[in-house]
Amino acid sequence: MVQKEVLELKRRFKKDRATFPRVCGVYVDANKQKQAAMNKQFLNLDEEVMHKYLEIANKTLSGKVGDALLNVNVHGGSEDQEDMTKLLMGVKDSHLEDDGLLNAFYDRVIETYDSAEPYYIILFYDAYDVMTKTSDNEKLDESEIVYEYILCSICPVKLSKPGLGYLEAENKVGLRIRDWVVQTPAVGFLYPAFNERSTDINAALFYSKNTKEPDHTFMESFFRCTAEMTKTEKKERFTSVLRNSLAESSNDAVTYAFHEKLNELAEERMEQDKEEEPLTAEDVKEIAEEAGIDEEKAEQIAKAYTSSFGNDKPTAGAVVDSKLLGQQLIKENAELKAKIVDLMAENAKLKERLNE
């Protein structure tokens, strides 16, 4: 899925637009036991409760595709994957009304999701009449397909912070009762994917709140797939490769020059509509040499890059250190302003001498 398709779905997650026929969930305690199952028609929820569930649904599709949101291939041909796909399709096709399938789904989550804390599994079901669009993105009246999907959110449940509060029954201020509060989702997923604005049963969209250390274990165990790195992980790994390869032989100027050249490549590919083209080892070597790094060291960086990323290579734009470039730009602007101030002061002194 691309960002535009995610936003198209999220636009529906508002009170006046939400059409979820049903929502269900179960609380899982610290001993991995199911408690307090819930299954209701979404529009029958109290207004405040509905608002909170919509917040969770929105959060489960938040962030950028390739970072917080990862496309997952769920069709690998293995028996485990076929069983998992069959279960997900069954849950979707039942419109969340088959308790046996729901319990099987919950059990699979509990089996594959590693958490020492209690959590709340939520499932939304929706059917979206996908409007046909013309080449200039104008909507037509007719709906060609109905996109049916489930959205799963796994939310940690934590004790509220201790503190003082007004105890109305006793008419005094004292220690308030600590409640177990449902947090924003740590992970979640959309199935089937909404690829090219249509149903793709061979793919899912996985959400991870933590992009630095996403829950790859759950993703791989649940979907029986190989997890890809987030853009944040790729960027940090690339930074580590560059730092370790340069070691003591580098300085800030060399690192800046490298990222400046890398950024030029990213912008060039964007202009050519090739921004998704992977950064090759040859690209890395060429950039290093253009940044003033000697050929031998550039070759070492390229080899370390290949060893670290294998076939899951990032794009140039994904690993550019924009923060470093921004800081350097601020520094250069400050230096330029200081020079201008000095020149203005010298100019003022010259005028004074001429007027004497």
Which residues are covered by each model-predicted region?
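Leu/Val/Ala/Ile-rich N-terminal alpha-helices, chiefly Sec-type signal peptides and the beginnings
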Residues: 8-34
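Acidic, metal-dependent phosphodiester-chemistry machinery of nucleic-acid enzymes
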Residues: 2-7, 41
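Long, hydrophobic alpha/beta structural blocks
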Residues: 29-351
